[in-house]
């Protein structure tokens, strides 16, 4: 029986129309058939076939509706268009009960009928629903759970005779087997080879929490696909993994679990390493490192000493960001919205103490310049770094103190408003505050205000919602150009971290200053006015912020305010009251941490010699492991005499060891260099190997590190270059910032957020209350919308999890978690498995077709689709990392191959050779994504070894050429027909063929044609 001849399709179309009619009437099916069938001319056998379809659908309607509804939560029959519903029931009936019609044929025919009756939207919808139904039924067949009486295409009943697939897809058996094989053969190990082009692929290494989360899985799967693809393209690939092992999380967890951070960390490393291996990631584990290993941080200590000797590391007393919960200092970059980056519920306060700093400001200009030389970095990251570095051109201006010889220096980018400065504001941290208030009646009020303000974080102090407050110091200074005495305030919105910690306040042209002046009844002076009108201070209700003409500005009156910036700066320099300068928002990197679990700072304090570095030959300064941690989170190091008491390297007298440890971002600022030579013990880095591998060609990680790890790494790389350890200036050539993994929350009115396993049929398992489904947000333990990757691996296998993480969205976009999506990925892999296994005997008889030859359809379609897919997947992976569209293209190739195999095309040796090429291409293209199943199928087809050693396929340009193309025909925007035209047809020829089409003529008959629109030779719209 031919399954998709023109007559057969006509019979199906008749059946659909009858079923559609029955949606609106109570007619008997045969009566409906008689009414509708009058318009159809077809052979008696086809009429009988159509009647059998209608009768079967009506008899099995309840069962069909149940299958359609249960195939996904995303659709319900009662919400579907009636026509779509009729087509779906018919196709589902064929797939379930007509065993002599291949299910894929039923699906394809339904899609075509949907296209004919409902247009592209209907066709796409039907295809999506039926694909899910097809996969569901396929899974049931594999598991022999689908057992019912079957019908054949003639409408007669036959007993079910479905047997087991010869070889079942069992990922839980084959995946560990292949992982063992890969490890034994050392296939992932990298070695320097000057004859080969290197490719260094790296994902940001994890903190060893003990359990990988789905964000890890997505991030590392993205990297693994790229690494495997590049290796198949002939590159010498380095793909290492290690552990960001120091830091407060391990220390806090150890305190909570009454254990030692070292034990906690190394046990977690072992557990996570096992999990990562179970995912099949292609890591070179010989290069594994942990930053808490003394053999790693000894070289970090050496570099610190070298930086100290070069003046790039120093210690000073300063106001620092302090987290009470962490009991340690935070760098500016670690304060987010005024709170600790690790404890967003806790506001950061200011504390004065001695701290160690690295001079990142020395490299600000160079890093800023190179922001324009990193085209492989996202614009968003570069913008964030530029803004954080914050380079500003302006002027430094001296405001002499009244009654004293000192002056207060101000940095401003708005020297054009200098004549309007009517008061001065200092930051509470400004070193001159204590000096200028000493002995004055305002001293206590000012000190109280300073202490109160320093308890607020910088973000809160400058936020719009915070009231702008200040206190008069009792002192004045001179405006250097007007010579007017102006009052000096201490204000909460002025930060010592920016500029000089002092601002000249111009209330008429700055809204914040305006509000402050109004609050404290301070003088206003307009110095910029619009070109066509005047401004009066008494009439102002807000500051004038637009550009304009200078007034009340001495010799600069009448000039445009922006045009006068340079001339005013020159005037200041000429008169010795200021000079042009550049200011940066970025401040030196404070690396001191008052915690235990970190790299000891290798410095010694001697009462006679001051600060002295540890002798380089005495490195590493090893963190003692026999200390008991303090429950308040503070470091035990200052209280351990065996650690603190030492001798001075200079005078050999008694001395004290530095007890601060380094910010853990120091360790992560160079680990990627050490991967190139993890076994090197003559220094931090082996120049020869580092020169071969660095820079990292592709780095992958979260955008949350834009002004933390990524900025620090760029700085540290420059330092290592200047110290002579490496030759590169930038560590990462290309950067991909992956999106977050998101999932809807579930809340119980009594128990709050619930884990997925605590919800049973939309009810709380603890109290049976109805559960509310909330917004789709980033997965987090606090909201309990997390998914355990291990549970998924145990259920579906690693390949399915890998595939879903790549297929659900592009890597730089957020991924919305979907159980149905995971199911769909698993079912697709089952289809690929059966594509090989079901035809293995025939496939093994032939070789894949690799010659040039002209074919005829349907074989030509398979041949063309094979090479189209190679081209599409290569482009998507190589140029865009759009793995989702690459996978979709392979799915289309699988559909095309199955369509041919289920059709009536000749199945001779040539055909099987072309099919083998298609099947092998499918397996090869999928191998970076799902390496276990593809290596297994590759071996089944008679090959030896892993696909990782198989060259990535090239496409044949000749095979992509097509003689005909499909053109969609519309009348007034509605699809009415489709025609095939020669690929070389002109627009005029296509227009003529469209107007001659029988269906188009039927819809334009008796109407005037206003115009005919031909769109890119793909669509014709006839407007009547």
Region spans (language model):
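Catalytic alpha/beta core of large soluble enzyme barrels
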Residues: 223, 236, 430-531, 536-538, ...
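Residue patterns forming the tRNA-binding/recognition surfaces of aminoacyl-tRNA synthetases
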Residues: 168, 177, 181-185, 256-416, ...
């Amino acid at each position: 029986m031919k399954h998709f001849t023109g007559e057969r399709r006509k019979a199906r179309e008749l059946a659909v129309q009858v079923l559609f009619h029955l949606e609106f009437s109570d007619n008997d099916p045969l009566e409906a058939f008689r009414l509708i069938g009058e318009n159809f001319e077809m052979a008696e056998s086809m009429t009988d076939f159509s009647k059998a379809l209608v009768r079967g659908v009506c008899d099995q309607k309840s069962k069909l509706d149940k299958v359609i509804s249960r195939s996904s939560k995303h659709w319900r029959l009662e919400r579907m268009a009636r026509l779509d519903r009729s087509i779906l029931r018919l196709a589902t009936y064929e797939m379930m009960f007509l065993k002599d019609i291949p299910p894929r044929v039923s699906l394809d025919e339904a899609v075509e009928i949907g296209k004919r009756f409902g247009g592209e939207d209907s066709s796409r919808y039907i295809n999506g629903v039926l694909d899910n139904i097809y996969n569901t039924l396929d899974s049931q067949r594999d598991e022999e759970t689908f057992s019912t009486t079957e019908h054949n295409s003639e409408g007669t009943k036959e007993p079910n005779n479905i047997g087991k697939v010869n070889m079942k897809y069992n990922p839980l058996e084959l995946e560990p087997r292949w992982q063992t094989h890969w490890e034994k053969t050392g296939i992932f190990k990298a070695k320097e080879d000057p004859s080969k082009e290197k490719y260094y692929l790296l994902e940001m290494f994890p903190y060893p929490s003990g359990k990988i989360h789905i964000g890890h899985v997505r991030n590392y799967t993205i990297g693994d696909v790229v690494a495997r693809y590049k290796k198949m393209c002939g590159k010498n690939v380095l793909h290492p993994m290690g552990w960001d092992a120091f830091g407060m999380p391990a220390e806090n967890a150890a305190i909570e679990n009454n254990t030692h951070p070292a034990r906690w960390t190394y046990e977690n490393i072992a557990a996570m390493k096992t999990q990562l291996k179970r995912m099949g990631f292609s890591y070179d584990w010989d290069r594994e490192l942990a930053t808490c290993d003394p053999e790693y941080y000894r070289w970090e200590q050496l570099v610190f000493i070298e930086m100290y000797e070069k003046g790039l590391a120093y210690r000073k007393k300063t106001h620092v960001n302090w987290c009470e919960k962490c009991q340690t200092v935070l760098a500016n970059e670690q304060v987010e919205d005024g709170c600790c980056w690790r404890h967003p519920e806790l506001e950061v306060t200011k504390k004065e103490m001695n701290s160690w700093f690295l001079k990142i400001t020395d490299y600000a200009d160079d890093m800023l310049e190179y922001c324009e030389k990193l085209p492989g970095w996202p614009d968003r990251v570069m913008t964030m770094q530029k803004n954080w570095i914050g380079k500003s051109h302006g002027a430094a201006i001296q405001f002499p103190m009244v009654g004293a010889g000192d002056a207060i220096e101000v940095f401003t980018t708005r020297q054009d408003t200098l004549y309007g400065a009517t008061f001065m504001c200092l930051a509470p941290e400004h070193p001159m505050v204590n000096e200028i208030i000493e002995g004055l009646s305002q001293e206590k009020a000012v000190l109280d205000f300073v202490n109160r303000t320093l308890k607020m974080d910088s973000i809160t102090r400058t936020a719009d919602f915070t009231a702008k407050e200040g206190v008069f110091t009792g002192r004045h200074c001179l405006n250097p150009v007007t010579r007017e005495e102006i009052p000096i305030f201490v204000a909460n919105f002025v930060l010592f971290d920016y500029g000089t910690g002092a601002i000249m306040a111009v209330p008429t042209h700055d809204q914040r200053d305006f509000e402050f002046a109004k609050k404290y009844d301070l003088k206003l002076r307009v110095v910029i006015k619009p070109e066509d009108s005047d401004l009066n201070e008494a009439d102002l209700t807000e500051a004038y912020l637009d550009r304009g003409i200078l007034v009340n500005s001495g010799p600069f009156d009448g000039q445009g305010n922006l045009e006068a910036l340079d001339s005013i700066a020159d005037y200041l320099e000429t008169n010795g009251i200021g000079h042009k300068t550049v200011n940066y928002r970025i401040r030196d990197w404070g690396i001191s941490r008052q915690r235990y679990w970190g790299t000891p700072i290798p410095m010694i304090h001697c009462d006679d010699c001051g600060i002295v570095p540890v002798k380089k030959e005495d490195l590493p300064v090893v963190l003692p492991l026999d200390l008991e941690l303090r429950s308040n989170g503070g470091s035990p190091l200052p209280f351990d005499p065996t650690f603190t008491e030492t001798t001075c390297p200079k005078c050999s007298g008694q001395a004290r060891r530095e007890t601060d440890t380094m910010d853990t971002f120091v360790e992560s600022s160079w680990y990627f260099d050490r991967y190139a030579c993890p076994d090197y013990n003559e220094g931090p880095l082996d120049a020869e190997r580092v020169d071969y591998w660095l820079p990292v060609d592709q780095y992958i990680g979260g955008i949350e590190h834009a002004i933390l790890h990524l900025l620090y790494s760029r700085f540290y790389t420059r330092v290592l270059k200047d110290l002579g350890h490496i030759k590169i200036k930038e560590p990462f050539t290309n950067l991909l910032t992956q999106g977050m993994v998101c999932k809807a929350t579930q809340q119980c009115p009594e128990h709050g957020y619930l884990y997925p396993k605590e919800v049973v049929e939309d009810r709380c398992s603890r109290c049976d209350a109805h559960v509310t489904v909330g917004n789709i947000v980033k997965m987090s333990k606090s909201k309990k919308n997390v998914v355990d990757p291990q549970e998924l691996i145990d259920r579906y296998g690693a390949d399915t999890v890998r595939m879903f993480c790549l297929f659900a969205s592009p890597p730089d976009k957020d991924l919305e978690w979907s159980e149905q999506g995971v199911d769909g990925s698993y079912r697709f892999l089952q289809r690929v498995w059966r594509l090989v296994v079901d035809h293995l005997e025939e496939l093994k008889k032939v070789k894949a077709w690799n010659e040039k030859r002209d074919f005829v359809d349907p074989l030509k379609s398979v041949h063309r689709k094979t090479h189209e897919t190679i081209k599409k997947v290569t482009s998507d992976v190589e140029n865009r990392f759009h793995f989702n569209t690459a996978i979709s293209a392979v799915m289309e190739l699988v559909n095309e191959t199955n369509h041919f195999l289920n059709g009536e095309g000749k199945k001779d040796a040539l055909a099987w050779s072309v099919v083998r090429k298609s099947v092998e291409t499918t397996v090869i293209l999928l191998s970076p994504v799902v390496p276990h199943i593809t290596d297994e199928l590759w071996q089944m087809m008679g090959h030896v070894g892993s696909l990782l050693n198989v060259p990535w396929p090239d496409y044949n340009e000749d095979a992509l050429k097509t003689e005909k193309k499909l053109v969609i025909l519309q009348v007034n925007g509605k699809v009415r027909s489709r025609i095939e035209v020669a690929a070389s047809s002109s627009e005029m020829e296509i227009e003529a063929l469209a107007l001659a089409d029988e269906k188009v003529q039927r819809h334009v008959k008796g109407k005037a044609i206003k115009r005919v629109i031909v769109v890119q030779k793909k669509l014709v719209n006839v407007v009547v």
